[in-house]
Amino acid sequence: MAGDSRNEPMFCEEGSSESGYVLCVIDSLKKKITSDRFVYIQKRVEENSIKLSPITLHSHNLSKNRQTSTSNSTDLVSNLLTKRKEDALCAVNSRESSPDESEGANCQDECSSTVIVGGNLSARNSVRPIRLPEVATLPPYTTWIFLDRNQRMQEDQSVLGRRRIYYDTNCGEALICSDSEDEAVEDEEEKKEFKDSEDCIIRMTIQECGMSDAVLETLARDIERAPDDIKARYEILQGEKPEGSSKKVSELNVKMEDVYGDKDLDAALDSFDNLFCRRCLVFDCKLHGCSQDLVFPTEKQAPLCSSDEGTPCGIHCYKLVSKPDAIMEIDSHLLVDVEEPTSDNLKDQIGSNKKKLGSSGQKTKSQQSESSSTARVSSESSESEVQLLSNKSPQHSPGLSKNKLGAKGGIKKSTNRRIAERILMSVKKGQQEMSPDSNSIVNGCHWPRDMKLRSDTRSGIKDSVVSSQCNSPSTRSFRKKGTLQMENNSSFVDAQSDSMEDTNNEHSATDGCDSSRKEECVDESICRQEAHGRSWKVIEQGLLLKGLEIFGKNSCLIARNLLGGMKTCTDVFQYMNYIENSSASGALSGVDSLVKGYMKGNELRTRSRFVRRRGRVRRLKYTWKTAGYHFIRKRITERKDQPCRQYTPCGCQSACGKQCPCLTNGTCCEKYCGCPKMCKNRFRGCHCAKSQCRSRQCPCFAADRECDPDVCRNCWVGCGDGTLGVPNQRGDNYECRNMKLLLKQQQRVLLGRSDVSGWGAFLKNSVGKHEYLGEYTGELISHKEADKRGKIYDRENSSFLFNLNNEYVLDAYRMGDKLKFANHSPDPNCYAKVIMVAGDHRVGIFAKERISAGEELFYDYRYEPDRAPAWARKPEGPGAKDDAQPSTGRAKKLAH
């Protein structure tokens, strides 16, 4: 049967329509699947029967042997069932009776309080039960998740539209909490999963008949699915092919770097923009969620400048390659024999140099060629080549010393500088042509201590050389000092100048050759820089743009923070030099022009800041009234218990007007908004001195806000010893005391049995009045969600809801911290306060009075009068004031 079904051809008559042909194919597939299923089941039944036969045979033999042994045995004890029946607990077969009624009554009383064990025994065993002392049960405890910061409720945790079931302790059963039948949720249709047989029919039918609307509709009618579902299922089945799957994964891993390399920075950061929270600076923020609206600030911060610019960042730092250390080493080797000459051997050296003047010309030519090659090698910008320069220079230094000392005195002092320039002209000129930005390099780097000059003559010559390259104020001071030092050694330098004038003709003969070689070096350097610039990918250029925007022209910080593993510090420095060199010829385009624009913009911005600092400081009159907008001042002065407004950053690209979302919502613009700092609606922080932020004179404290180090002038946070570029720590007198929630400087709170009700929160250490104890954390839910959850909380006689602002309520039932167990009291020792911290409203618990260690914490829940439970209502008195607002929902805690 199975064989006939397999060999049955899947075709129909030629005259049948397309739908009939599809039905014919489906029927044939069903028959084939049914026959295969029948064969498979029959085969499994046979296999299971073979496996089961030894087990059943063994059990049958055991039962037969047991029955034989029981029938042959005459001992009644062997009958286990009879023995257990006779020895059953509390079974009494014989009991002594007494004619005396009083004794019978006593016996009954005794038997009622005892348990008799054993029936056919000669003596009865009685056990008197012992009553255990009653122990108070633990109060109800809810399993909860600890939260150190608030978290927005997940969508699947909502109770809206769901049946709420609670346990009623009075009747001892679970009940459904529902106000009306409308809240009953209809049962959702179970999603049918595709079976293996259906997958086979879909795959084989589409492969046989093709994918068309008629085929999909026919399959949908036969399988009772939607055509779109069938089409999606077929695509899934096609994608689940194991063939070549491992090869595809390996190809994806190999090409992953190339895929990101071809994209620009915005495309590569698309997913990061959705996941990264720019307010909390974390990924997958639980408070603000993902896919936030991107707000681009109008004003950007100035680039970060590193204070330790002279220290190399690593072995690939440009400071170890591009600064003229190799030139300084050449200078030291060239002048090693000239250092500190004496008057005794000076005449001998002059005489010997006059005799060897003829041979010195050839040596000078070789020296000039070596110097030109040295200049070409020094432009390679690598550490190994710098070491080669230091090894080559001592070989030709004796010849130079002999040529320099064979001349007479009598030349003017002004020739000293010209002598030094002639000695190193071939080295310096090539270096200047190939690196036009050497001035900025020298100015931005500090000379090493081991390169200090050890004599007056050497310092004078080297200072004159440096003066030809850089014009900084420090270089000018060295130039003046070097001139005075060279005046003291004028006789020695005059002799040097005569020898140089004698060999001037030989030098001029080699200048033409040197200039041609220098031009070749420049051309090679330019070609190398162009090839280096073309090797940069689009994403690397985008990261460089972002690095210039953040760190300025600091190659070390850009390579370390943004281009790690892609480009080194030297690569970044050379690419920026290539951009500057190419900008002069106007050959820039695309990203290169943007890089040049950012580099110029940073220079102009830094220059303008420097000019402003030189001017007179303008002191503005700053009071607490200028800190925020008028509605904030109105709330500060009137101290009305108005609900706080939820803050949402605005994306205004200019000064906010009447259409600003912050202005229409009734909130101030914060640092997260896109508007400039001069916006009139922006909260400007405080200018309090030292620790004066805990009084109402502080605008932040008066507006129920914490100070922000980015906004307030004197309220900042310092850490470390200043080595990382941040200010040092100050004493306690300079610490701002209005940043407790921001810095999480809470007290230690313990959890224990409360003397009032259930569990309670206790303080570990003593604190003073108005000290910050901790934060009341929980889930951020809507007011509608809070009303739904509050029905259960009210019936369970518990309260974990806390009003936060006009949009959210804090619920600490499932998630929170230990302060959720602080009980209510009409005469509390703590108080709750809603404070805005970095744009978010948070609830802080503060000490209302001095609290000793181990004391339980209480605060007034401040329930609304018509919603407060009986245990939380204040006793009515003749002088009681009702200052609460009418309620619109379930019982929720309120802050002061």
Swiss-Prot record:
Residue spans of biased composition, Polar residues class: 391-400, 465-476, 485-498
Spans traversing the lipid bilayer: none
Superkingdom, natural source: Eukaryota
Enzyme Commission code: 2.1.1.356
Keyword terms, alphabetized: Chromatin regulator, Developmental protein, Differentiation, Flowering, Methyltransferase, S-adenosyl-L-methionine, Transcription, Transcription regulation, Transferase
PROSITE patterns documented for this protein: CXC, SAM_MT43_EZ, SET
Catalytic activity: L-lysyl(27)-[histone H3] + 3 S-adenosyl-L-methionine = N(6),N(6),N(6)-trimethyl-L-lysyl(27)-[histone H3] + 3 S-adenosyl-L-homocysteine + 3 H(+)
Composition skew (Low complexity), residue ranges: 358-390
Region (Disordered): 344-419, 459-514, 869-896
Residues binding S-adenosyl-L-methionine: 861
Domain SET: 747-862
InterPro entries noted in UniProt: CXC_dom, EZH1/2-like, Hist-Lys_N-MeTrfase_plant, Pre-SET_CXC, SET_dom, SET_dom_sf, Tesmin/TSO1-like_CXC
KW Transferase (keyword) present: yes
GO BP term (any one): heterochromatin formation
Chain ranges of the CXC domain: 633-732
Classification via Pfam families: preSET_CXC (PF18264), SET (PF00856)
Feature: compositional bias, Basic and acidic residues: 504-514, 869-884
Tissues of expression: Widely expressed. Highly expressed in young panicle.
UniProt GO MF annotations: chromatin binding; histone H3K27 methyltransferase activity; histone H3K27 trimethyltransferase activity
Note: Over-expression and down-regulation of CLF respectively, represses and promotes flowering in long day (LD), but has no effect in short day (SD).
Family (UniProt): Belongs to the class V-like SAM-binding methyltransferase superfamily. Histone-lysine methyltransferase family. EZ subfamily.
Name of the protein: Histone-lysine N-methyltransferase CLF
Species name: Oryza sativa subsp. japonica
UniProt gene name: CLF
